[in-house]
Amino acid sequence: MPTSPFIDDLIRDRRAKRGFLDQPVSIEMVKDILSAAKYAPSSSNTQPWRCYVITGEARERITTAAVEAYRAAPEGLPPEYPFFPQPLHEPYATRFNSFRGQLGDALGIPRSDITLRRRDVERQFRFFDAPVGLIFTMDRRLEWASFICYGCFLQNIMLAAKGRGLDTCTQVFWSMQHPVLRTELNLPDDQMVVAGMSLGWADNSLPENQMSISKMELEEFTTFVHE
């Protein structure tokens, strides 16, 4: 049977990394990653994605503004779109709570420690110290199908980065920073902030980057229909 072990390994090895080394990533490498990712499928070739590459002084300015905005409103600004239903129902609530507990244990943050939890959120808005931050926007007049297309584009970026030895963390939290990003990036009103992404060389010595995340077995999410 034909196999593609390289692609399969990239998919299995990709993980969200929440801490990066102080090691630069060349703009040429970022361009190569995005140039490969643009071949993602999209409905009727609509290609709804738009990407902002944040580095250098701009990265420092934007992350500082984002952290300051979060400190001014630590309960969080309304995101451009809802992340989860409230309350989150089963089986998703169990999976969510299991992951958050595992991450909290790796970070050494008890759920009751609001100060440390907020400090961890601030790390999100510093792109987890990655040298490159990506911000993704989409025309808000588009409908739900475009989010499916966007997911394909984001996955392509993650895999293209992984194939070059880099790692990523996709962060929907950046959607809550749309006022800051609208100002800093001069975003038009018709562009909604979909997500951000940290891109760099992972610091795999960090406990949070050594987590083993369980996935459903094939039989749990697949139904084979023969007749």
Curated annotation (Swiss-Prot):
Binds 2 FMN per subunit. Stable at 40 degrees Celsius and below, but it loses activity rapidly at temperatures above 45 degrees Celsius. FMN binds at residues 14-18, 172-173, 215. GO terms for molecular function: nitrobenzene nitroreductase activity; nucleotide binding. Induction: By nitrobenzene. It is an enzyme of class 1 (oxidoreductase). The keyword Nucleotide-binding applies. The keyword RNA-binding does not apply. GO terms for biological process: catabolic process. NADP(+) binds at residues 44, 109. Keywords: Aromatic hydrocarbons catabolism, Flavoprotein, FMN, NADP, Nucleotide-binding, Oxidoreductase. Its EC number is 1.7.1.16. Optimum pH is 8. Pathway: Xenobiotic degradation; nitrobenzene degradation. It catalyses: N-phenylhydroxylamine + 2 NADP(+) + H2O = nitrobenzene + 2 NADPH + 2 H(+). Inhibited by dicumarol, p-hydroxymercuribenzoate and salicyl hydroxamate. Belongs to the nitroreductase family. Involved in the biodegradation of nitroaromatic compounds. Catalyzes the two-electron reduction of nitrobenzene (NB) to produce a nitrosobenzene (NOB) intermediate, which is immediately reduced to hydroxylaminobenzene (HAB) by a second two-electron transfer. Also active on menadione and nitrofurazone. Replacing NADPH with NADH results in a 4-fold decrease in the reaction rate. Monomer. This is Nitrobenzene nitroreductase.
